[in-house]
Design a protein with these regions (language model features):
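Helix-loop boundary and gating motifs at the non-cytosolic
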Residues: 9-49, 226-235
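Residue-level signature of mid-helix packing/kink "hotspots" within the transmembrane helices
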Residues: 56-64, 148-149, 254-262, 347
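Structural signature of the two symmetry-related core transmembrane helices
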Residues: 77-91, 275-289
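Paired small-residue
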Residues: 100-108, 298-306
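C-terminal membrane-cytosol helix-exit motif in multi-pass small-molecule transporters
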Residues: 172-192, 379-383
């Protein structure tokens, strides 16, 4: 699928990046927008978190099925169908205020999200040369992260200046753009998922590979903290009377991602993930604590820079680590596990941290969420020390 072993930026890889940015931007605008819309509609932050949880759990359940069928489906056709499916779901939600119906639609959108993102990740990793896997996944991760960070920011800005209906209209347009780009995808039988023999395996073997478990669990912990930011940063901003300025948090993260990702991918390939995970963890802890104690836009912005550095490094490093630990025919499985772990972190973080916020306030919640990163770095350190001992033995 690529003309040169060492070439990364082929036309097809660039196309996948464009589709990924557009699709993630759409879905994350909906994630941030639905949470705020339902919270204001019901005057219940927990219901706002349920909207995110329903969406993410649907994606988590869907991904293993996608991994099982990866060898049997026409990826381009399924991708196009799922994009149209998500478009129809958004159209139905336009003008609706019945919360059970909106939750049901979010579940359906989660199914579309789970299938589509797994297909895009597998297409991308099969286009990336092995010797540039860290760099390639870094760029793919930048595409997903730009959508993930800019989406909530744009949603906040639109809701402050326009309406939820206008936000839905914009997301419909983005899905149409993604669909248009997807028509130009070319799938050849030389892809690793096409040329790898299909082995007789149990259901568990199809959807799970223990070699990818640790990086997937660690990225889940990180995304629990990010869920707290996506779903509740607006509430903290209202307490501090920042208004629409709170959306700058996501803009700063997006800028940091663009600046950091190209370098972090090369560091991963040349030096390994340990030179990225340790400093990123420290930045994340400091960033969350600064959010908790921020009393103005300056401290808020510094927190965004530090957390943005962590976000820029964590997601692609753990995903590349997971993919590198499995065989070629299990790349789809590793990608599905990694993406499902991110979704699980978002799904668990929303209601759990929402409950914590109800007890301690938003500041207490962000302070306590930093403990998740402490657990992450301790588990990573334990694995790192174990690897060192095994190398010396």
């Amino acid at each position: 699928m690529y003309s040169s072993v060492s070439k990364l930026w082929t036309w097809q890889f660039s196309l996948i990046i464009l589709i990924t940015i557009s699709f993630y931007l759409c879905l994350q605008m909906l994630t941030g927008g639905f949470s705020i819309f339902v919270t204001e509609l019901s005057h219940n932050p927990t219901l706002g978190g349920v909207m995110t949880t329903a969406f993410m759990l649907a994606a988590i359940i869907t991904r293993p099925v996608t991994g099982i069928l990866m060898h049997k489906i026409n990826i381009k056709k399924v991708l196009c169908v799922m994009l149209l499916f998500v478009l129809v779901c958004i159209m139905i939600s336009y003008g609706q205020q019945v919360i059970p119906l909106l939750i049901s639609l979010r579940i359906l959108e989660g199914i579309g999200f789970g299938v589509t993102t797994t297909l895009l990740a597998t297409l991308a990793t099969n286009l990336i040369p092995e010797e540039r896997m860290g760099e390639g996944i870094g760029y793919f991760g930048m595409a997903t992260s730009l959508g993930t960070t800019l989406g909530p920011m744009i949603a906040l800005s639109i809701l402050h200046s326009f309406s939820f209906k206008f936000l839905l209209f914009i997301t419909m347009f983005l899905i149409v753009v993604s669909f248009g780009f997807s028509l130009f995808i070319k799938i050849k039988q030389s892809s690793s998922f096409a040329e790898s023999p299909i082995k007789k395996e149990s259901l568990v073997d199809f959807v799970f590979d223990k070699r990818a478990m640790l990086p997937c669990f660690l990225v889940m912990l990180f995304y629990c903290t990010y869920s707290g930011i996506v779903n509740f940063i607006n509430g903290l901003g209202e307490e501090e009377h920042l208004g629409s300025k709170v959306s700058l948090f996501f803009l700063i993260i997006a800028v940091v991602i663009v600046l950091v990702r190209p370098f972090s991918g090369k560091i991963y390939d040349q030096m390994g993930h340990k030179y990225l995970i340790y400093p990123a963890s420290i930045c994340s802890i400091i960033g969350l604590i600064l959010i908790a104690f921020a009393h103005g836009l300056t401290t808020f912005s510094i927190a965004a820079v530090l957390y943005g550095i962590a976000y820029s490094v964590m997601q692609p490093s753990f995903q590349a680590w997971a993919v590198s630990r499995v065989t070629a025919d299990k790349k789809g499985t590793a990608n599905a596990m990694s993406l499902s772990s991110m979704d699980l972190g978002m799904a668990l973080g929303a209601p759990v941290l929402g409950g914590v916020a109800s007890l301690t306030g938003y500041r207490g919640m962000y302070s306590l969420s930093s403990l998740l990163i402490v657990v992450l770095i301790l588990m990573y350190m334990a694995r790192h020390l174990k690897d060192i001992k095994e190398q010396k033995a």
